Amino acid sequence: MNSLEQAEDLKAFERRLTEYVSCLQPATGRWRMILIVVSVCTATGAWNWLIDPDTQKVSFFSSLWNHPFFTISCVTLIGLFFAGIHKRVVAPSIIAARCRTVLAEYNMSCDDTGKLILKPRPHIQ
């Protein structure tokens, strides 16, 4: 394979990688917004739950029953983590990190957007 064919292959690989990473960005942004909203709701509900004077006087489950906003947002947050939201909000960086691991064997790397970085060849003496 001559160097022109290699360059074309590298360009095609780079185009595909940047296309894939950029395709993940809108979904990642939506998942981040969902995580932020649910986290803020949980924090607000927790604050209201903790400052309520009746919280110390009743049982734990009665206290949760009296604060449905906190209970629902907390259950939603836990459900989102079980569904893997913590992986979905960082999906492009996971892909880039895995590509860096593979590309390191070929003296290459890539940035977080998928652009290839060619490293100089090591000199053998």
From Swiss-Prot:
Location (main, coarse): nucleus
Subcellular location: Nucleus membrane; Cytoplasm
GO MF annotation terms: protein phosphatase regulator activity
Pfam family for this entry, one: Tmemb_18A
CC terms in the record's Gene Ontology section: cytoplasm; Nem1-Spo7 phosphatase complex; nuclear membrane
Keywords: Cytoplasm, Lipid metabolism, Membrane, Nucleus, Transmembrane, Transmembrane helix
Gene Ontology biological process: lipid metabolic process; positive regulation of triglyceride biosynthetic process
Residue ranges of the TM segments: 33-53, 65-85
Record carries keyword Ribosomal protein: no
Signal peptide (UniProt feature, chain positions): none
Membrane topology summary: Multi-pass membrane protein
Presence of the UniProt keyword Transit peptide in the record: no
Domain of life of the source: Eukaryota
InterPro entries tied to this protein: NEP1-R1 (IPR019168)
Similarity comment: Belongs to the CNEP1R1 family.
Primary role: May form with the serine/threonine protein phosphatase ctdnep1 an active complex dephosphorylating and activating lipins. Lipins are phosphatidate phosphatases that catalyze the conversion of phosphatidic acid to diacylglycerol and control the metabolism of fatty acids at different levels. May indirectly modulate the lipid composition of nuclear and/or endoplasmic reticulum membranes and be required for proper nuclear membrane morphology and/or dynamics. May also indirectly regulate the production of lipid droplets and triacylglycerol.
Protein name: Nuclear envelope phosphatase-regulatory subunit 1
Species annotation: Danio rerio
Phylogenetic placement of the source organism: Eukaryota, Metazoa, Chordata, Craniata, Vertebrata
